[in-house]
C-alpha cells in the first residue's frame, strides 16, 4: 500500500544551476531523482501527544515508507531538520533532549540546523547533544568571540548516487537577544545572509557540489516583512545570487509555508491539502510547521546540472480534527489515514517516557478556569497566566511589582488538576527568579523602555502591579500597586535573569547595586505558589485594563 498521494505536482517546476563549473561526476543526459524530507521546531516532542498525534515512532514509519518508495524508483533521500530540538516537553527537557536525538538517529536524519533553543542550556549540554547525534549539527554563522573561529561545522557533504550535495547550516542572529545572555559571553551570531554568501563561494571554489541546500533556523516572513525579528529566509534568498541555492529548509517561525498567493502564506492551512512552498529569487523555501506535526516532502529531478522540483507536499503525522456530532458528543478524527508507530522506536523511547512521566504526573494543585498562555495571546495582550507567574515571583521575592517577556510563557493550563508537567510546559527554560531594588526615577525609566517592546514578538511585556497609559514613547498615569510612582522612593521589582541580563533587549539590571539573583528556578517558584494558593481562582489574576497603549 502506498503511504502517500502526490501533493503539489509538475506545475511547481523550478531550476537550480550552480554558477561555477563543477567537476562533473554525474552522467550527462541522465535524470537523477532526489527527495528531500524535512521537519523543524521539534521542541521535545519525541512521544505522541495525548490524542495520538505526531511523535518519532510514527515519523519513522512514514520516513521508512518514503525511503522504500523512492528507492524503488531509483532515487535517493536526504532528511533534514530546521532545528530547535530542545525545549517544550518536560519529559524531554528533564533529560536534555537525549530521547529526541537518539530517536532522530533511528529515523535517520542526515543533518540539522542549530536553532536558537539549542542555547537554552549551557554550551556543555549542546556539546553532549552533538555526541548523542549521529548526524552533524550545522551553523556557519556562530563564532567564538575570543578566537574568531566558528563553533560548529558550517556545512556537510553528502553523496547521493553520482551527485555531491552540500548542506549549509544557518542560525538566526536574534539568538543572542532572545536567548539567555549568560550563555553568550564568548559567542557571536553573525548575519546569516552574509555568511551564506561566503560559504557558497567557498563551496563552489573548493568542493564544487552539484547541489547546495541551506538548512536554516531563521523564520519565514511574508514578503520579507520581519518586523522586530531578525531577517529570515525570504530576505536571505533575495540577497543571494539568483538560484545559488536549490532550496532553503527552514524553521523558527513555526509555520506551514504553504502559499496562498505570491508573498502571502495561507492563513489556516488544512492538513492533507495541497501545499505550494514559497519561491524567492529562484530558491524554494519550505517549512513544516512544528513538533513533527508534518514531514515535508520535496521531490526533485536533477539532469545535466539542473535541479527541478516536480512535487511538494506536507504529510500530516496522525493529525486530528475535533468533530462534534448531532448528539452533542465530540471526538478527534484523523485528517489522513493513520500511520502505525514503529515498534523499534517505541522500545527505544519508552524508558525515557516512563522516567519522565513518573516525575511529572503528580498533582500539585487545581484551577477553576483556563490560565491563558497561548503564543497568540501572551505576545499581544496581558493574560491571567502572566499575572499568576508574576504573582509567584513577587511572593517569593517580596517585590512590589514584576515584569517579564511574554515570549517566556510557553503554554496554557486548562481548568482542573495541575501537575508539575503542566507548570514545566508553561516555563520550560529553567530561568532564575531575580529582583532589583530601584528608585522611583529608575522605575520610571525602566518601565518606559520596556513598554516600547512591540506586540507580536517574544519581547512583549507582561506586567503585575503596574498601571499606565503609554503614548508617544512616554508613560502617563504610571502607578505601582495603585499609587503614583514617587521618584525618591525605593521599589523592588521581580523578573527573570533572562530579562535582567538584557534578554529580548530589556535594560540590564544585573550590574545595578540593588540586583539579587535568588537562585530559585522559575518553574519551581510557580509550582510552590500553586501548591500554597490552590485551588486557584482565575478571576483573581484576570487583567482589568491596567496597562494600555495609544
From Swiss-Prot:
First-tier enzyme category under EC: hydrolase
CDD domains cross-referenced by the UniProt entry: MPP_UshA_N
Domain of life per record: Bacteria
Entry keyword annotation includes Lipoprotein: no
Site (Transition state stabilizer): 117, 120
GO BP, sorted A to Z: nucleotide catabolic process
Keyword Transferase: no
InterPro entries named in the record: 5'-Nucleotdase_C (IPR008334), 5'-Nucleotdase_C_sf (IPR036907), 5'-Nucleotdase_CS (IPR006146), 5_nucleotidase/apyrase (IPR006179), Calcineurin-like_PHP_ApaH (IPR004843), Metallo-depent_PP-like (IPR029052)
Catalytic reactions of this protein: UDP-sugar + H2O = UMP + alpha-D-aldose 1-phosphate; a ribonucleoside 5'-phosphate + H2O = a ribonucleoside + phosphate
Residues that coordinate or bind Zn(2+) 1: 41, 43, 84, 254
Molecular function per GO: 5'-nucleotidase activity; metal ion binding; nucleotide binding; UDP-sugar diphosphatase activity
Binding residue positions for substrate: 375-379, 498-504
Activity regulation as described: The activity of this protein is inhibited by an intracellular protein inhibitor.
Cofactor remark from the record: Binds 2 Zn(2+) ions per subunit.
NCBIfam families: PRK09558.1 (NF007109)
Subunit structure: Monomer.
Protein's name according to its UniProt entry: Protein UshA
